[in-house]
A protein has these predicted regions:
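Contiguous beta-sheet cores, especially beta-hairpins with glycine/small-residue-rich turns
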Residues: 25-199, 261, 265, 270, ...
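Second-shell loop/turn segments in exported
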Residues: 64, 173, 233-241, 345-353
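Compositionally biased P/S/T/G-rich terminal and signal peptide-adjacent segments
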Residues: 203-230
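Terminal, regulation- and interaction-focused segments at domain boundaries
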Residues: 221-251
Length: 407
């Protein structure tokens, strides 16, 4: 029998391929999504069915395979909102994120909010945001103390009350999130995606010019900063940046990070106000840590609406160069709460011990800006996997350093 002509064979193969179902990937229920608001929402102004738009800010993988890239759009609506009508009533805000736009498709998703990043509010087991009670804040407790003084010394109590009102603003209990606030969700039902995922921000990355030289450079760097008071080892470095100061500052600004104020009397006073009023302070100062005896050259942070929680990092200029470019190293941690040190009589932050999560946070934020040219993860065999910072928090890391080369 004569063989099939090429045109017929190719036509049959094409028809067979078109008849196959598109390659599908199932993202299981329980998978976490990290998102960033593009829409302002508030318990006292938002209404049911108001649209809410966000972007996914961290890639989602399934068994190591890319599924949902960072940068895709996730849309939702407000499903409920109630005001804090007085200091004893909690504001509430409920959201439903239900449509993922990916690869030119709009796909129905089922999600539940699990956390609002660095927020003073909490999220209950139904995914509803619960506001604070204004009468439970430090400012309100100060009012109670002044009232007790006024019971014995009416004139003095009035003087204290007037002084307090001149310094501190009344705490508002309503929930208000600007564009840029970040949230965590979980899928409540499996999500089926067809076809390959669209490229994420990492698709445009270029290989580093001389990886061996970069590995040597990384492993020559000091790996742990030191505090001055008390003089103890502190944060472990987890990132290196290659580029000018302007490039580094521009990338962090585009990623929504703020430069911290210098530690001084004015910033200390503003910190005290932020704690008392239970609000954010986007340029809050950080304690000074030293690397090779030098204080940080740049400090950035990302805060929502409370001083007690924040992403923050310190960056030190190094004497080295790579491919003729400036070299910086960075230590980043996530403050998850605040405590008072009776010994030092100061407020101190408690941190998430898994510092590699903060490294991933920073890397993902910077990749989304489109200003990173190359990324390399470098092993550091001489860096310990476990340690402590100067205030006694545990530190756990895989010891790798993320090296980002800026465009």
């Amino acid at each position: 029998m004569a063989p099939y002509p090429n045109w017929l064979r190719n036509s049959l193969l094409t028809a067979w391929a078109l008849a196959l179902p598109a390659l599908a990937m199932v993202v299981p229920a329980g998978t976490q999504l990290q998102i960033r608001l593009k829409t302002k929402i508030a318990s006292n102004t938002s209404k049911p069915d108001d649209p809410v738009e966000t972007i996914v800010i961290a890639p989602v993988t399934v068994n190591g395979t890319p599924a949902i890239p960072a940068g895709v759009t996730l849309r939702g609506v407000v499903t409920g909102a109630s005001e804090a009508t007085d200091p004893t009533v909690r504001a509430t805000l409920a959201l439903d994120f239900r449509e993922l736009e990916i690869g030119g498709q709009r796909i129905r998703v089922h999600t539940q909010l699990t956390a609002v990043e660095n927020a003073r509010e909490s999220v209950n087991d139904k995914g509803e945001i619960q506001g604070i009670l204004a009468n439970e804040t430090l400012s309100s407790r100060m009012d109670s103390g002044i009232d007790k003084v006024a019971e014995k010394y009416s004139g003095f109590g009035g003087l204290l009350s007037a002084a307090k009102k001149a310094v501190f603003k009344e705490t508002e209990g309503d929930i208000s999130y600007d564009a840029g606030v970040e949230m965590d969700l979980k899928l409540t039902a499996a999500l089926t995606l067809t076809g390959p995922p669209p490229p994420g921000p990492d698709a445009a990355l270029q290989p580093v010019a001389d990886p061996r030289a970069l590995v040597d450079l990384v492993n020559r760097q000091p790996f742990q900063s030191r505090a001055q008071n008390p003089p103890k080892p502190s944060d472990i470095t987890t990132m290196m940046f290659i580029g000018s100061q302007e490039q580094v500052q521009g990338a962090f600004a585009d990623a929504g990070w703020h430069q911290a104020s210098k530690l001084g009397e004015k910033s200390k006073f503003e910190t005290m106000r932020a704690i008392a009023e239970d609000r954010g302070y986007s340029e809050a100062p950080v304690s000074i840590l030293y690397l090779d005896g030098r204080p940080p050259d740049m400090v950035f942070e990302k805060i929502n609406n409370t001083f007690s929680k924040r992403h923050h990092l310190r960056i030190w200029l190094r004497p080295d160069q790579y491919q003729g470019q400036t070299v910086w190293v960075c230590a980043a941690t996530h403050d998850t709460g605040i405590d008072f040190s009776a010994k030092d009589r100061i407020f101190i932050h408690k941190i998430d011990s898994q510092i590699d999560l903060e490294r991933s946070k920073v890397v993902n934020d910077l990749l989304l800006t489109g200003k990173v040219q190359s990324l390399l993860m470098v092993d550091r065999p001489n860096v310990p996997r476990n340690g402590q910072n100067a205030t006694g928090d545990n530190l756990t890391t895989d010891a790798r350093m993320a090296v980002l080369v800026f465009e």
